[in-house]
């Protein structure tokens, strides 16, 4: 009898422990080593850290970094992160500062990555890799040499890949082709070799008079493409102007994952180039 009672007590204890473990697992807060302000940063952390750090991205790649409404689950992840890496342009964004405040994480290390230029440009991307490796080394000094070694290799890969992309663009005869483009794409479009006649901001911020001026400038210059930015929200501006300008509208992305099957920097830059060359070919066919 005593033996049966003891077995019953042990079984009850085991069941209780399993139930407790299940509850804790279901309700455990997300744990992230590094929260990233963009997919660009998150991808680089993965490369530099060799996939050994858990990362999450605060801002989805297909949305505007300054206008995204951060979700409670993302704030909870930030509350349980050791560090938060952001672009220098994000440090004044209300959605970012608000998320940091709402996370209420006194131990959170915020690293601002001071890199100038469009991160889709190979040289800028390589600089971002270096800055992220340095920041990771400051947080995890025991792994600093490992991070730096990975960063050096990754930067070399990026620059070499960029040369191949540049060759594709030159073969596509983009040098000197006149375009108008979104301000947020000017760095990449200029690097690609296009002649930027004018730039424009977010479509909802443009007045009818500004749109009319853009059309006039584009008509006078004889632009071939109107290049929109995916993350600016509306991608209809170019489409609405192309008939007046006799140009082709195309939308490209500033972040890996913004367009389908572009989860890495290489895939994202290749997709952008594909779209630009396709649009240029379309313009050449209709123009001539």
Where are these regions (language model features)?
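Extracytoplasmic substrate-binding proteins
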Residues: 26-30, 105-178, 255-288
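Helix N-cap/beta->alpha junction signal
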Residues: 38, 88, 182-183, 230
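Short, well-ordered beta-strand elements
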Residues: 32-37, 53-58, 178-179
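Acidic/His-rich segments in extracytoplasmic proteins that coordinate ligands and/or metal ions
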Residues: 52-139, 234-248, 275-279
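Secretory targeting signatures
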Residues: 1-30, 288
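Structured C-terminal subdomain patch of bacterial secreted/periplasmic proteins
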Residues: 32-33, 80, 215-288
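Alpha-helical, coiled-coil/dimerization segments enriched in small aliphatic residues
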Residues: 49-74, 185, 189-215, 251-262
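Extracytoplasmic/secreted envelope proteins and their assembly/folding machinery
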Residues: 38, 42, 75-78, 93-97, ...
